[in-house]
Swiss-Prot record:
GO terms for molecular function: 2-methoxy-6-polyprenyl-1,4-benzoquinol methyltransferase activity; demethylmenaquinone methyltransferase activity. This is Ubiquinone/menaquinone biosynthesis C-methyltransferase UbiE. PANTHER family: 2-METHOXY-6-POLYPRENYL-1,4-BENZOQUINOL METHYLASE, MITOCHONDRIAL, METHYLTRANSFERASE. It holds the Pfam family Ubie_methyltran. Belongs to the class I-like SAM-binding methyltransferase superfamily. MenG/UbiE family. It comes from the Bacteria. InterPro entries: SAM-dependent_MTases_sf, UbiE/COQ5_MeTrFase, UbiE/COQ5_MeTrFase_CS. The lineage of its organism: Bacteria, Pseudomonadati, Pseudomonadota, Alphaproteobacteria, Sphingomonadales. It catalyses: a 2-demethylmenaquinol + S-adenosyl-L-methionine = a menaquinol + S-adenosyl-L-homocysteine + H(+); a 2-methoxy-6-(all-trans-polyprenyl)benzene-1,4-diol + S-adenosyl-L-methionine = a 5-methoxy-2-methyl-3-(all-trans-polyprenyl)benzene-1,4-diol + S-adenosyl-L-homocysteine + H(+).
Length: 242
C-alpha cells in the first residue's frame, strides 16, 4: 500500500489529503499568524520579492495555486494582472474572498481546485505561482505535471517553499525555534499546537533544493533556477515551459 508523509508520520494518500485539509481548516482564520510564527514575519518581504521575480503584466492571466487567502494574488493584482486563485480548501478561499472585498481588489477569480487534478484546459495560463503550498500536496510530482500542462508555451513556473538551510549555526538555531517554540505559539495564540507542529515537520520532510529542482525538470520545465534565501531556509524555484 502506498504511503506518503504527513509530518513525521507515514499515512495513506487519502488520509494525508484529509489530515492536511483539517489543518488548514483550523488555521485559515489565523493564516498570517502562522506564517509570522514560522518566518519571524519575514514572509511578507519574501512574498514581495517573489512577485517581483514573476514580473506580472496587465495582459497576463496567472494561476495562483494554494493561494486561498490571497497573499500572493493581491500583490499580483496590483499590476492589473488577471489572477485565478485556486485552493483545495474552501475555508482558505472564504478568508481570501473576505479580504479581497475589504480591500476592494478586483481582477480575481476564485476556484476550489486540487493541484494534482486541475479542471483547466491545457495551455491557458501565462504563469503559475505557488507559495508555501506545494509541500502540503499529497503527490508533489503530479502537481508539478499539472502546472506544466495548464501553462502556455513560454509560460513561467514559480514556487516559493521552505527547505533546509545550509548555514549550520543558523540551521541549529532555527530547528530549536521551530521545534520547540512555534508549536507553543500555536497553542498560545490559536489553541492549536498540533497544526503548527505538522507544518514544521512537513518542512523537514520536503525534498531539498536540489531534489525538488530535479522534480521540476521531470515535469518538463527548462531553465530551472533556485534562489535560496537565508542559506536555503526558503527557496524560490522557477522554470519555463517551451
Amino acid at each position: 500500500m502506498e504511503k506518503v508523509s504527513f509530518g513525521f508520520s507515514d499515512v495513506s494518500p487519502q488520509e494525508k489529503t484529509h489530515l492536511v485539509g483539517d489543518v488548514f481548516r483550523r488555521v485559515a482564520s489565523r493564516y498570517d499568524l502562522m506564517n509570522d510564527a514560522m518566518s519571524g514575519g519575514l514572509h511578507r518581504l519574501w512574498k514581495d520579492d517573489f512577485v517581483r521575480l514573476v514580473q506580472p503584466k496587465a495582459s497576463e492571466h496567472i494561476l495562483d495555486m494554494a493561494g486561498g487567502t490571497g497573499d500572493i494574488a493581491f500583490r499580483l493584482a496590483k499590476y492589473g494582472t488577471n489572477v485565478t486563485i485556486a485552493d483545495i480548501n474552501p475555508a482558505m478561499l472564504e478568508v481570501g474572498k473576505k479580504r479581497a472585498i475589504a480591500r476592494s481588489i478586483e481582477n480575481l477569480t476564485w476556484k476550489e481546485e486540487n493541484a494534482e487534478a486541475l479542471s483547466f484546459n491545457d495551455n491557458v495560463f501565462d504563469a503559475y505561482t505557488i507559495a508555501f503550498g506545494i509541500r502540503n500536496v499529497t503527490h508533489i510530482q503530479k502537481a508539478l505535471d499539472e502546472a506544466w500542462r495548464v501553462l502556455k508555451v513560454g509560460g513561467r513556473f514559480f514556487c516559493m517553499e521552505f527547505s533546509q538551510t545550509k548555514w549550520s549555526g543558523f540551521s541549529n538555531l532555527y530547528k530549536m525555534y521551530s521545534t520547540h517554540i512555534v508549536p507553543k505559539i500555536g497553542q498560545l495564540l490559536a489553541n492549536d499546537e498540533d497544526s503548527y507542529r505538522y507544518l514544521i515537520e512537513s518542512i523537514e520532510r520536503f525534498p531539498n533544493i536540489e531534489k525538488f529542482s530535479d522534480m521540476i525538470k521531470s515535469a518538463g520545465f527548462v531553465q530551472i533556477r533556485a534562489r535560496p534565501i537565508l542559506g536555503g531556509l526558503v527557496a524560490i524555484h522557477s522554470g519555463w515551459k517551451v
